[in-house]
Amino acid sequence: MEWTDDGIVLGVRRHGESSAIVELLTRGHGRHLGLVRGGAGSRMRPLLQPGNSVSALWRARLDEHLGAYALEGTRMRAANLLGASHATYGVTHLASLARLLPERDPHDGIFERLERTLDDFDTAGEAAIHLIRFELAMLTELGFGLDLSTCVATGTTTELIYVSPKSGGAVSRQAGEPWRDRLLRLPPFLREADEEQSGWSDQDLLDGFELTGRFLLRHVLEPRGQGHSDARAGFINAVVKHQARASAAAISG
């Protein structure tokens, strides 16, 4: 058995004296593990960092076997990602989200979104927006998508500024006003069809994380006996600190 595919490194662990078991999210074969001979050595270490994209050749005698990988780097992002605390936490959290997908089950849409997310992860605010959208996409992929296009109460498609914490449906300004204190806020960057990242505030980011975090916890994590990863909290904290420093610099400058 053998195949070739594009992959993104999610994680690596040592195996024996010199090898490593590498976990990839691949475009056509889903989340897939394989043995990399020599993967524990210093020569391979830069390649096998989470967040890097690779071209993968997988071989095994039988399909159900672990198999062995031969990997070549295609986008070596890790060095840049490790240079910022928000990116370090973010990559770890993204990998934990990808592990919610069944092993060896293709999810090419999630693969494409993960690549786009990692390619635009340098700036803390933009990274936060990408990560929130990734969490939203994961909810959809796992069967718990939120309907943010139409007001769940009236059917209107304008002035959608709230989300019902019960149904996960959008709520318009007028329909939600009497219950505004009980509703979740829908940040503008999740309402825009073209996914433009302009026009957001620090509070919008926090609202976005509250929104996706609530439904991930209820529908995905708690049924598995899990909670949010420490990396998620670390990412949010790093983004908040970065935005505070940026605001202070803008005022003093």
Curated annotation (Swiss-Prot):
GO terms for cellular component: bacterial nucleoid. It comes from the Bacteria. InterPro entries: ARFGAP/RecO, DNA_rep/recomb_RecO_N, NA-bd_OB-fold, RecO, RecO_C. The keyword DNA repair applies. It holds the Pfam family RecO_C. Keywords: DNA damage, DNA recombination, DNA repair. The keyword DNA repair applies. GO terms for biological process: DNA recombination; double-strand break repair. Belongs to the RecO family. NCBIfam families: reco. Involved in DNA repair and RecF pathway recombination. PANTHER family: DNA REPAIR PROTEIN RECO. This is DNA repair protein RecO. It comes from Nitrobacter hamburgensis (strain DSM 10229 / NCIMB 13809 / X14). The lineage of its organism: Bacteria, Pseudomonadati, Pseudomonadota, Alphaproteobacteria, Hyphomicrobiales.
